[in-house]
Amino acid sequence: MRRLLLPLAFLLLSTAAFAQVGELRSNLAVGFNGGYNLSRVDFSPTIKQEFQPGMMGGVTLRYTTEKYFALICAAQLEVNFAQRGWKELIEDGTYNTYHRTTNYIEVPFFAHLGWGQEERGVQFFVNAGPQFGFYLPSDKEEFYGFSEEYPWDESKRPGGTTQQYGRAIENSLEYGIAGGLGMEFKTGIGSFLVEGRYFFGLSDMFGNSKADPFGRSANTTITGKISYLIDITK
């Protein structure tokens, strides 16, 4: 948890610093978002993986506080449902297939910094800040053998790493750092946003004590998303 305090403190100090100068704004915008996730789990010892696809979507609130020279400063909060997980790249000659989908409610809190048009037009933006997640116990775990000749067989896994199979998620609370880059298209009927985002987990889904099989088991996710926002106050 201490690893999260530095970026959180930076976010709060940055917001406080911007609040002391610049042209004040008071713009509240709300809307919804949706997108596509490509996820992996950073395991130690390492498990070879491909990206596990999944969907995400939720609601967005953004409060713009001021314009500092050309920089438009805001705070952004989201509450999203997100599918994550991992898909193993099994290369031990068994032709087995394994993937697991995990579901989370994620709550990112961002410093949102934009450059461009405030009214109608295009604005480029950066989002950065902490993200918290809450695990929903509704996993989908799928594993297959290739044929009767090549059934499901864990015995040949590199390093004998098989403890992830069927293992319950032990830590329901997740935290990490997220950041994104995107473009906002401001129109007369609201704002349309396109964003690419990356999440780096700092917490582990499984226990990480010396007695546990994994020293690290943290989510990492690449997200492509679109959002629609409408101004409530200006």
List PLM regions with ranges.
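Extracellular loop and loop/strand-boundary signature of outer-membrane beta-barrel proteins
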Residues: 42-48, 93-99, 164-169, 209-216
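Predominantly the C-terminal beta-signal and adjacent terminal strand-loop region
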Residues: 25, 174, 179-234
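Residues on the lipid-exposed face of transmembrane beta-strands in outer-membrane beta-barrel proteins
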Residues: 32-36, 57-63, 81, 107-115, ...
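Residues that define the transmembrane beta-barrel architecture of outer-membrane proteins
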Residues: 26-28, 49-55, 101-107, 122, ...
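Short glycine/proline- and aromatic-enriched beta-strand/turn motifs that initiate or cap beta-hairpins
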Residues: 20-58, 62, 231-234
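Bacterial Sec-dependent N-terminal signal peptides
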Residues: 1-25, 33, 226-233
